From Swiss-Prot:
Pfam families, alphabetized: Ribosomal_L6 (PF00347)
Name listed for the protein in its UniProt record: Large ribosomal subunit protein uL6
Gene name of the encoded protein: rplF
Lineage: Bacteria, Pseudomonadati, Spirochaetota, Spirochaetia, Spirochaetales
Function: This protein binds to the 23S rRNA, and is important in its secondary structure. It is located near the subunit interface in the base of the L7/L12 stalk, and near the tRNA binding site of the peptidyltransferase center.
Organism expressing this protein natively: Borrelia duttonii (strain Ly)
Alphabetized PROSITE patterns for the sequence: RIBOSOMAL_L6_1
A GO BP entry: cytoplasmic translation
InterPro entries named among the record's database cross-references: Ribosomal_uL6-like, Ribosomal_uL6-like_a/b-dom_sf, Ribosomal_uL6_a/b-dom, Ribosomal_uL6_bac-type, Ribosomal_uL6_CS
Quaternary structure and partners: Part of the 50S ribosomal subunit.
Length: 180
């Protein structure tokens, strides 16, 4: 039995779960998420809990067991609480501006980068160097944060670039000049 897969998922009072065939829909105060489920996995609701079980015991199904339990848990948490990732821009003259549905980055290049915010994702700016990516789908929030970070990955010498708030940049020592 999968250690993660066997844990029940508690359904909050504000969350509504609907299971039809191999499709689960979770609806809450923040929105609605749907997920198709592999035919080797069974999902049922018992006593205000979601139970994920497997139909077979082969290696692939055991892997799916924990995966789908985690996906459903993230759906329930997302529609009730939501997810967020914070990023910080480090560097002289590096900044971000929001205009409508786009972010414009000045990252030390001669041109600005434009990033169009995808639907279902909210972005808050705190000043011009802090970015908060928020949404109900954990996967999409992480993907958008990774795309923004990839515009200017932090470099190891001065730490200039876009980094996650909890990320530690391993610094390197620069060249040491030889004295004669």
């Amino acid at each position: 039995m999968s250690r993660i897969g066997k844990l029940p998922i508690k359904i909050a009072d504000s969350v509504k779960v609907d299971i039809k065939d191999n499709f689960i829909t979770v609806e809450g105060k923040r929105g609605k998420l749907s997920q198709e489920i592999n035919s080797s996995i069974r999902v049922k609701i018992e006593d205000n809990n979601i139970i994920v079980e497997r139909a077979f015991n082969d290696k692939q199904t055991r892997a799916f067991h924990g995966l789908y339990r985690s996906l459903i848990f993230n759906m329930v948490k997302g529609v009730s609480d939501g997810f967020s990732k914070s990023l910080t821009i480090n560097g002289i003259g590096y900044r971000v501006e929001q205009q409508g549905n786009s972010l414009f980055f000045n990252l030390g290049y001669s041109t600005q980068f434009e990033y169009v915010i995808p639907e279902g994702i909210n972005i808050r700016l705190d000043g011009n160097t802090k970015i908060a990516v928020e949404g109900i789908d954990k996967c999409r929030v992480g993907q958008v944060a990774a795309e923004i970070r990839s515009l200017k990955v932090p470099e190891p010498y001065k730490g200039k670039g876009i980094k996650y708030d909890n990320e530690v940049i391993r610094r390197k020592v620069g060249k040491s000049g030889v004295k004669k």
